[in-house]
Amino acid sequence: FATVDCSDHPKPVCSLEYMPLCGSDSKTYSNKCDFCNAVVESNGTLTLSHFGKC
């Protein structure tokens, strides 16, 4: 089971690095920062499906 540590998020600005992650909402996030910000906004309902594009 893939996990990402989002304890240092949310962040106001994310880098432009491209390391895609697939969320449990079947959306591809461009990097960990984008994904973690979405996790925080979802109040923990969003989880990581897998690394890479959905």
UniProtKB/Swiss-Prot annotation:
Pfam families: Kazal_1 (PF00050). GO terms for cellular component: extracellular region. One of its GO terms (molecular function) is serine-type endopeptidase inhibitor activity. CDD domains: KAZAL_FS. It comes from the Eukaryota. Keywords: Disulfide bond, Glycoprotein, Protease inhibitor, Repeat, Secreted, Serine protease inhibitor. The record marks 16-17 as: Reactive bond 3. InterPro entries: Bifunctional_prot_inhibitor, Kazal_dom, Kazal_dom_sf, Prot_inh_Kazal-m. Residues 4-54 form the Kazal-like domain. It is found in: Secreted. Disulfide bonds join 6-36, 14-33, 22-54. SUPFAM superfamilies: Kazal-type serine protease inhibitors. Glycans are attached at residue 43. Avian ovomucoid consists of three homologous, tandem Kazal family inhibitory domains. This is Ovomucoid.
